[in-house]
């Protein structure tokens, strides 16, 4: 279990945890919403723990770069962080990284934590756990899986706060404020 945010269930404020040992995780939101911050925060905590093999993929300039930050031979699980994965998840993507990502999403020994701007069926059908950063456009927010009742609790100012999102795990959803990445 990986702490990543403060959660508000309407009664208590508590720490929210991502279960990186059971299934893929989608992080969905607009540019500047806090997706990369969340990936970096989680990657640094897992890296420091030494509990698993860490991979981090991102686009730099016009090419995809993957850093294998730490391999852990005693642990079978790989956690693969993919930032700005929209292009790789496109059904028309013809690059090797796209094929590797699609294979990893189906591999039970790999947890993919992928950040995208728009909800995509390729990712959503493989991710029962999501952190969605609402944009204020109700139809788009509901497509991300955010229940209307949770959206009703968001004020106008909430949409402008980086890291303010909704943690969705199977049939449960609650507002969260993600931790801020402080650097390695």
Predicted regions, residues:
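Conserved P-loop NTPase motor module
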Residues: 1-29, 33-48, 129-131, 156-184
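Generic beta-strand/beta-sheet core signal
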Residues: 21, 28-30, 56-57, 82-83, ...
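Walker A/P-loop NTP-binding active-site region of P-loop NTPases
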Residues: 30-69, 116, 125-126
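Short acidic, S/G/P-rich loop/turn micro-motifs used as interaction or catalytic elements
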Residues: 32-34, 60-63, 85-93, 119-121, ...
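Generic, well-ordered alpha-helical scaffold segments in large soluble proteins
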Residues: 33, 41-49, 84, 88-91, ...
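Conserved ATP-driven motor cores of ASCE-family P-loop NTPases powering translocation/secretion/packaging/pilus
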Residues: 38, 100-182
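Loop/turn-to-beta-strand initiation segments
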Residues: 50-52, 76-79, 105-114
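Conserved P-loop NTPase "ATPase switch" module shared by AAA+ and STAND
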Residues: 60, 72-95, 111
């Amino acid at each position: 279990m990986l702490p990543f945010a403060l959660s508000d269930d309407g009664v208590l404020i508590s720490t929210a945890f991502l279960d990186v040992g059971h299934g893929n995780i989608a992080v969905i939101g607009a540019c500047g919403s806090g997706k990369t911050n969340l990936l970096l925060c989680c990657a640094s905590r897992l890296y420091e723990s030494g509990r698993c093999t860490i991979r981090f993929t991102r686009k730099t300039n016009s090419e995809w770069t993957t850093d294998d930050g730490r391999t852990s031979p005693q642990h079978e699980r790989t956690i693969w962080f993919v930032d700005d994965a929209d292009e790789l998840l496109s059904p028309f993507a013809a690059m090797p990284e796209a094929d590797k990502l699609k294979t990893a999403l189906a591999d039970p020994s790999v947890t993919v934590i992928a950040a995208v701007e728009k909800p995509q069926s390729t990712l959503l059908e493989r991710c029962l756990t999501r952190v969605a950063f609402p944009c204020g456009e109700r139809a788009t927010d509901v497509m991300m899986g955010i229940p209307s009742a949770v959206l009703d609790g968001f004020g106008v100012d909430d949409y402008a706060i980086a890291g303010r999102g909704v943690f969705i795990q199977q049939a449960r959803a609650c507002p969260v404020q993600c931790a801020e990445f402080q650097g390695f």
